[in-house]
Amino acid sequence: MTGDERLAQVAPHMRQVRLQQLEFYAFVHFTVNTFTDKEWGDGTESPDIFAPTALDAEQWVTAVKSAGMRGLILTCKHHDGFCLWQSKLTKHTVAYSPYKNGGGDVVREVADACRKHGIEFGVYRSPWDRNCPLYGQGRAYDDFFIGQLTELLTNYGRIFAVWFDGACGEGTNGRKQYYDWDRYYDVIRKLQPDATIHVCGPDVRWCGNEAGHTRSSEWSVVPLRTRDTEKISENSQHTDSDEFRQRKISAWDEDLGSREILRNEPQLIWYPAEVNTSIRPGWFWHENENDSVKPLNELIRIYNS
């Protein structure tokens, strides 16, 4: 078999095919940060701060659909640890907030609206938790993480995507957690076998930045070594930084999939890239940034580049 024939043998899994058929989907960021005016919460915020008065999940979803998007991924829990669903494993959740007198479930509202309007629903759950005292304690935190992951994957119908970033800062005890990624993946494959696992996952790789920059040729067949969660985490955002959000791809990873590169690689995989970029300077809503929303022509340029 020639080198080029070997490259042609690498094929996607059906879940990867289905994802790429979606083409375009929303990444919705909403949590306590929306009310504290922060990009990153630190886990000490009171659930009392979460008090939306006009949340309309159907409006979100119909806006997504009108833009031609076919899916929506919701930040069910960001680094602060606050859960937008009625988690039974923590008190840092909507159940202890004023929203609907503690009876609200934003994940339920958005999932139901997506289903009603024919939009695929996915979940983001940060591996970092700045509120949970178990973070940094190895298996104890992994058990907690899997417990919350199980809640999300068993109570809200079909999930098309599970999105993990590589955030791995310190917890309340000053320790970092070594994530048991393979164990997390096994749970997802068992509970939602059709879901793609993104970024710190085996199905979809990160393009390498949050500014919408990609390589001139973004190949789906790449070396197996690119699926290295430690390397992904190392290159992920570790502090709230505008500079990070605007950075371009670094020189060391400009070419991942040319024939010249792949012919010398012992193992190859189908690992398509995903571009995640915000329409605002950061990911969360801040009133003082309302005049800094990317114009339509810029968004179209990013999409087409």
Regions found by a protein language model. Give the residues of each.
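Mature catalytic domains of secreted/periplasmic carbohydrate-active enzymes
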Residues: M1-S305
